[in-house]
Amino acid sequence: MGTMNHRPSRTPNPLRPASGPAHPDADRARTTARALAAALGVSGVLHLVRPAVYDSIVPRVLPGPARAYTVVSGVAEIGIAAALLSRPTRRLGGTLAAALFVAVFPANVSMAGRSVRSGRASSVRTAIAIARLPLQWPLVSRALLVRRAS
């Protein structure tokens, strides 16, 4: 009998996409990933350099100090931005970005509610706070596109 050529089986790497034809939305997903990474990176840095702005929108019902939520969310945004920029971790980055956008939605609702109830907030600030609410869902959708096509 001839010798059999056996290759050791490779365990698939969950961070590396399987080879094969590119997803039809791969180019759009890559561009979207870069845009999301830029937005998340800037927002994450702002959380760390101007935390008081974000402390004020942490829902009061959450236990513990608002600053802890501000710092953790800022670090998470920077980490997710990095994951979105790296091809091997882009799929994970899309998943985490979608989860983050859903997780921060209560803070956006809280900010809009406080802005409406407060007579001190400018009408422009109130309009921005309210306009952000429906815009959160396209962000989730774009992050899921990155996940799906990466």
Regions found by a protein language model. Give the residues of each.
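Short amphipathic, positively biased membrane-proximal segments
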Residues: 1-150
